[in-house]
Amino acid sequence: LRSTKVAVKTLGSVAASDLIAVLESLQIQVADEGDLTVVLTDDYLNPKLDKFNQQALKSQSPWMLVKPLGTIAWIGPLFNPQKTGCWDCLAQRLRDNRPIEGFIHRQKHVSSPLTPPLGFLPSTVQTALGMAATEVFKWIIQGENQQLENNLIAYDAIALQTQNHTWVKRPQCSSCGEMVNGLTKNPLPVVLEHRQKTFTADGGHRFCSPQETLRKYQHHISPITGVVRELSKIPGNGLTHNYIAKHHFFSIFDDAASLRQNLGGRSAGKGRTDSQAMASGLCEAIERYSGVFQGDEIREKGSYQKMGDKAIHPNVCMNFSQQQYHNREQWNGECQGWFQKVPEPFDEEREIDWTPIWSLTHQEFKYLPTAYCYYGYRPDYKLDCWADSNGCAAGNTIEEAILQGFMELVERDAVALWWYNSLQKPQVDLDSFDEPYFQSLKQYYQTINRELWVLDITSDLNIPVFAAVSRRSDRSVEDIVLGYGAHFDAKIAISRALTEVNQILPNVLFAKADGSTNYPPLCDRLAVDWWKTATLSDRPYLVPSDRVAAKVRGDYREMASDDLLADVKLCQQIVEKNGLEMLVLDQTRADIGLRVAKVIVPGMRHMWKRLAPGRLYEVPVKMGWLQEPLTQEQLNSFPMWM
């Protein structure tokens, strides 16, 4: 105590003298320059903290932040340049978790924090300062304070509770990170390894159980320091567990509607068990977060023409038709939801940022526009492509992420072929799978006056894909709900489709006084249009085909192995056998650890309304489903709304 000196600085309206008095009462030596500096502030994003942080990093001096004002005081973290992250690491997370403030900053072109007046009592300030002084005392006596080096502690004076919020060092931090700036780095190939599966029960084949995934990554859930602000369970029927996740997300359409969606929740998780649904929600949130453009991604400048063969034209992946481009202004003015919009035609001469993507097929880097690869990348020209989540997945290993991402591509591609060509497909005999869960679902749906059935919509890739369909049977508005699933294991694919139907079902369950459906106010307008207007009589492709026998369990061979790498290799073989190329963008973020991959197979179709020539027209003829390809005008005019 005698040899260690503590300095107190203040940035904001808090007086240093109050904390100095508490420190001195503990016999702590206070000086203008100390072995540890405590900084008092009323906002952890005070711009002056940046300069203080840089000085502390330069001098390798530990320091600690305290906000004693407001009903919830913040104590810590304690920044130690030799051991922990810095203020910049923390500030990045704090900004991400203030979506309304960030939106106002971007709209008004201001950067200073919007600190509201903080209500407090002298007694609550004294309590917070006393807690902070005690932590300083511990640091001096023990030579360290691991609790504060790893956490921001929030003290709620009203609830009389403290909460620890884990914060992590960001290896990519521009102030203290050891990773070099992304623009100067060379890309690394995606190297795959053998990975033994240990979990194959629910939702997919995994390297480890959902409980283990949660244990490893749930520290990323925090409204203050986390990448996921909130993970909440949605009340349900008990047959499927559903979670919704709120997290930072940047859309290129930076408007009030996008902000509302961010605040309401961008990601969801589903599963037959609570832990599976919770892990699913957390992983999808981290997947989305990891795909947001941060500025340190590896990029290469050039035009499509000058990049040569290594560049992939984005419309080979997006698949908009010339007619869609031609009519885009009228369509965009009328369409609902950003995922139905059509971008500007791609300018092949414009110099833009390109992102390297590893081709598993050719074992070399190819390039796609960065705007296509990352959410929220905002160029200074009219948008000619943008990112979506198709083929994106998180996993405990990169192999697991690639497998899940590829199955999503297969699912969406099969949905597009079935939906836009309005093809009747065989029903699946759920009883043949001898799965109690399937029976329980069917029985539950009967009790709420709904029918439930499953169609086999497997494509030419011969990976099982299913569409689960449910409609009301007691009135003219049928509120038809759909869910999809793809997997090497047909039973898991069916389960995915059924749990997705169950995930969407709450949107159509509640009634108004007149008996009509009471749709949630923030529901997508296109989805509500579908629920109000679609009927089986108008949409015969939703009805099982009576020309072929129902599919039974014995019709599906076992395709999966016990090794995730072998499964990925099989996916690659299937792609290449059909004359396509399989590419992977590793979107894993160094400060998170959960592996995230975006799998891209140019030519495979999204389920949204993208009507360029190719598989959409060719596969139904190749497979004998149609005698000749439909014209664009003959395709199903109602966009897939999910």
Range-by-range predicted roles:
Residues 1-7:
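N-terminal charged helix/coil linker that caps or initiates catalytic domains
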Residues 3, 147-153:
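A glycine-biased structural micro-motif
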Residues 7, 11-13, 19-26, 34-128, ...:
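E1/E1-like adenylate-forming module used to activate ubiquitin-like modifiers
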Residues 30, 60-65, 452, 582:
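Hydrophobic beta-strand scaffold residues
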Residues 31-33, 66, 89, 455-457, ...:
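Conserved beta-strand termini and adjacent loop/short-helix elements that scaffold enzyme active sites
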Residues 131-139, 283:
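Short glycine/serine- and small hydrophobic-enriched flexible loop segments
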Residues 161-642:
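Helix-biased "structured C-terminal domain" signature
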